């Protein structure tokens, strides 16, 4: 493995807000002007490279991952050496200006490939938790931090959640979940598809569209509108929009520290097996983790996940379950290719 390379593992922050004026909920956080969003991202140390919106939310492809803005919810995930948690205070400030108050916060990440390269406050999970505790307002009084382990010391799932007594959600259905997949040791032949040809003369958008079709990413959810971007000389990001549900993929294809992530919102009634099979077939990872966050623990859904990927050569090596405030359950599963040891 390289001494140091690009950190693919993302940091992910999800903030929920509420307000007393029902008119605010029509656009809410989407009313924050683009210049203000740029200032938030400047604090994080990333920029917008592509953007799209529909009647439900706005999606931004960033120089380091993605940002999703709903009327009362913001999801921002960034990779590399970005300082994601420094977005919290400015986001709270801009939300307050339009009459919205923070009511929940969730921060998640995997284990960094290059932890010693991370800037403060991402130097350790303890530092991140201390920063979060000091930054979020006191009304978010129901708090919990947890490191969910696996059988491999290099793979764990870090979770911090904080909620006020008043928590509002767009989907109250217990069958709605968020799935975060992290993959390393990508098949080198498949990873080459995320390298651009030198001097191809294409824009990042057109090269991204080509990668989306070449790799079959457009077949994961054929109903989704995809906003994609290819970086030079390599790397890829995409945001998918399917009504009010998002999906996103980020790829760092370099050999030695290759990484890809897939995230989506879904329902236990969806064909989750199809989604997982397509994702695994596109990247053929040597190691993969799946984290699901939902209001209800579904053993049936977890079995579907295992049954979907085992025929493709991935064996479930560990599973951890933890409960968090506001009745959230997080399940963290790890898989490795059968040809590899844990």
Where are these regions (language model features)?
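Polybasic/polar functional segments that serve as interface/processing modules
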Residues: 1-342
């Amino acid at each position: 493995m390289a001494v140091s390379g690009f950190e693919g593992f993302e940091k992910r922050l999800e903030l929920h807000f509420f307000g007393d004026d029902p008119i605010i909920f029509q656009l809410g956080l989407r009313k924050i002007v683009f210049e203000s969003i740029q200032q938030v991202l400047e604090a994080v140390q990333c920029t917008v490279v592509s953007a799209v919106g529909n009647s439900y939310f706005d999606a931004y492809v960033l120089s380091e991952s993605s940002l999703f803005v709903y009327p009362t919810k913001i999801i921002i995930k960034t990779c590399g050496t970005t300082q994601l948690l420094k977005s919290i205070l400015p986001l709270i400030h801009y939300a307050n200006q339009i009459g919205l108050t923070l009511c929940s916060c969730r921060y998640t990440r995997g284990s960094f490939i290059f932890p010693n390269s991370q800037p403060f406050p991402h130097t350790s999970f303890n530092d991140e938790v201390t920063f979060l505790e000091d930054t979020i307002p006191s009304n978010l009084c129901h708090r919990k931090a947890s490191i969910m382990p696996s059988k491999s010391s290099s793979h764990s799932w870090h979770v911090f959640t904080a909620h006020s007594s008043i928590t509002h959600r767009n989907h109250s259905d217990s069958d709605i979940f968020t799935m975060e997949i992290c993959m390393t040791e990508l098949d080198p032949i498949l990873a080459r598809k995320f390298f651009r040809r030198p001097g191809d003369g294409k824009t990042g958008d057109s090269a991204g569209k080509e990668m989306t079709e070449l790799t079959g990413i457009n077949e994961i959810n054929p109903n989704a509108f995809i906003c994609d971007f290819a970086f030079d000389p390599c790397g890829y990001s995409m945001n998918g929009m399917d009504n009010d549900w998002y999906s996103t993929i980020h790829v760092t294809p370099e050999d030695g520290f290759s990484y890809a992530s897939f995230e989506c919102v879904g329902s236990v009634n969806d064909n989750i097996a199809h989604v997982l099979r397509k994702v695994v077939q596109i990247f053929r990872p040597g190691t993969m983790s799946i984290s699901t966050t939902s209001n209800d623990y579904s053993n049936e859904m977890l079995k579907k996940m295992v049954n979907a990927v085992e025929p493709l050569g991935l064996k479930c090596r560990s599973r951890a379950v933890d409960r968090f405030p506001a009745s959230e359950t997080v399940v963290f599963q790890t898989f490795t290719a059968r040809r590899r040891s844990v």
